[in-house]
Amino acid sequence: MQIKQRITNIAWKLLLPLLLILIWLLLSSLNIWSTYILPTPYMVWSEFVDCITSGLIWKHVGMSLLRVVQVFLLAAVVSIPLAIVLTASHRMRILSSGMIEFFRHVPPLALLPLLILWLGIGESSKIAIVFLATVYPIFLNALMGFSEVDGKLVEMAHQYGLSKKQIFLHVTIPYAIPYIVSGLRIGLGYSWRSLIGAEMIAASSGIGYWILDAQTMARSDIVIVGIIVIGLCGIISDALFRWITNRMLSRYMTGGDVYGA
């Protein structure tokens, strides 16, 4: 029954993309626009296959993936302990709340000109941009998870004689896990979005650079291939993240599934 339901869900998810491709085919056949503006699906597919067989696509995807993984892990290592510190210290949380709120509303790409001046046009400026975009959703979700632990559970743990360390390990962390996982998942998506923008401005490799280079050569078919590759990378990385977190953390969840699916 579950397999049948999954197949049905996949079919529904594919319905809209297939419909869009059919509309694209129809518009291409009517020759309303030149292929310079709107390439045919066949042109895009042909270029996609060529990029795979030539190895060009793997070069750019590999560089972007390496940057995303590095920054994502760094953001997680920084943001979760920081959330724990601010949860434990009310004074520190009040002191930092103004800066947190200010930079939460500043788009990371707005800082790119300054970061290029300070760090140069190499990897450091791109890493910094992606880090700033990734760290906030992880940090804010972790902070919410640690801060909103049910007071009744904590009180009950005190009554059973649990120490602060035991309460943190056996009450606070399991309660905060869904928030942390949600923040990590959002942060992973943000890391892809910000990286592509950073690579378009300051890079010599990566998917963003590849798309911008195609635009300068008036290759709209390659631009569309790049957009498709970004979407596929995001979908695959999100699915892999869900699989890993479900395997690692489902024992903490009563339903056996971190995402409740």
Spans of model-derived segments:
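N-terminal signal-anchor/first transmembrane alpha helix
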Residues: 1-28
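Periplasmic/extracellular loop-to-transmembrane helix junction in inner-membrane transport proteins
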Residues: 3-6, 30-73
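Hydrophobic alpha-helical elements at and bordering transmembrane segments
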Residues: 48, 57-61, 65, 95-103, ...
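C-terminal transmembrane helix and the adjacent membrane-cytosol boundary/short C-terminal tail
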Residues: 90, 147, 182, 224-261
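Transmembrane alpha-helices
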Residues: 128, 132, 164-197, 230
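Short helix-to-coil transition segments within interhelical loops
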Residues: 146-149, 156-176, 216
